[in-house]
Amino acid sequence: MIVTSIGGTTMDVRPYRIDPATARQSIEAGEAVVLDLTSPLIGSAIRGRIPGARWVSPRDILDRNRHTADLVRALPDLPRDKTIIAYCTCPDEEASARLTRVLRRQGYDAWTLIGGLPAWRAAGYPMEANAA
């Protein structure tokens, strides 16, 4: 958790985070769509992705010159009636946290996977081969 203190109140500056166990339950119940923001090289090094995850270029998400509307249009069709779970392998979940903020501003129920793909894998949860 990254925290800051404002007026004596400590708060997580990265809200809307979901732990791997809760994410897995949502995915297995068919309640979530998963977005993979790993770089292809890092994803390959980890040897896989969360089953059914849709890949999104982290470069596009981290490009501060792109407008929010452009980012949302560049994404695969996302259902508004499902939870969106984004993950990456960035330090401090940078790409997935930014995408989560963008999607929430657009009215999606979006969450960042705490610890990203490494945490999912460390928990021993299912992985599938990366798309060729």
Specify the residue positions occupied by each region the protein language model found.
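Flexible, polar/low-complexity N-terminal or interdomain linker segments that lie immediately upstream
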Residues: 1-45, 130-132
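Active-site regions of enzymes building and remodeling cell-envelope glycoconjugates
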Residues: 49-59
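Short, acidic/turn-prone active-site loops that include or flank metal/cofactor-
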Residues: 57-63, 115-117
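Catalytic cysteine-centered active loop of the rhodanese-like fold, especially the PTP/DSP P-loop
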Residues: 71-121
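Short, charged, surface-exposed secondary-structure boundary motifs
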Residues: 62-69, 120-123
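Conserved beta-strand scaffold positions in the cores of enzyme catalytic domains, especially
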Residues: 34, 53-55, 110-112
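Short loop/helix-cap segments at secondary-structure boundaries that form the rim of catalytic
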Residues: 44-51, 120
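Short, hinge-like loop/turn segments at secondary-structure boundaries
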Residues: 51-52, 127-131
